[in-house]
Amino acid sequence: MFSRTSTEKFTSDCSAQIEQLKDTLCNADAVIIGAGAGLSAAAGFTYSGERYEKYFSDFEKKYNFGDMYSGGFYPFPTPEEYWAYWSRYIFINRYTDAPKPVYENLLKLVADKDYFVITTNVDHCFQNAGFDKKRLFYTQGDYGLFQCSVPCCHETFDNEAVIREMTRKQENMRIPSELIPVCPHCGKPMTMNLRADDKFVEDEGWHQAAERYESFLRTRADQKTLFLELGVGYNTPVIIKYPFWQMTAKDPRAVYANINFGQAEAPAAIRDQSICINADIASALERLL
């Protein structure tokens, strides 16, 4: 029904759209937040530039990749080096606080509303900011979880203790061999619980969150709903963006709002139901408070 080529960008001054979104948020019976990588980037979780140089300059010098994301695909020659990189990566993106209070400001906007969050982010920022865990659906995994690489089971395993130990004890871009994580059931290597292929483990908690999200959609079908999209691009639009467009098109009472600098757009078919704010997410949320 929709495609990127059919969208219209909203590039004018966003003051009117900010006020319109304030009013819509106030009057909405239900708010469904869809969050992508742009929201965490607005909170300061950037994967290149100064932050990358601060934590990974040694890896950059040795392996010549220019950002954290690219490093995640590098074929490190040993598991000790692989986990030295990934433990650092996980530690700074999962077990440190976001530099800016973007998620906290978002919570202030919806704390008194009937809300639910669906996100492709894996950095735990929503829970760290105080969002209700029962109102969150992390579709793509969590940096804070390991899974069997086979996988031999549908379990995930908390990794905070071992990640902290790896980062503390690594030297010369290597962790001690005894810290290499293995599956407690089959002894095969562990990996991150991140959706990359058909080996991604959707554990019991994942399925419970998915059901809560679907239940929220079903039970609010007769209410005035705001679909609030924040920082979602086109890497995986079928998870948040396209469903939000489709659900808005099916319900004349629904409103679709998109805050995303450079990608504030909506299909022409739902233009009259859309509020697109072409602005920095952090600044826009501050203006909405």
Roles of regions detected by a PLM:
Residues 1-289:
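Conserved catalytic alpha/beta core of Sir2/sirtuin-type deacylases, generalized to analogous enzyme cores
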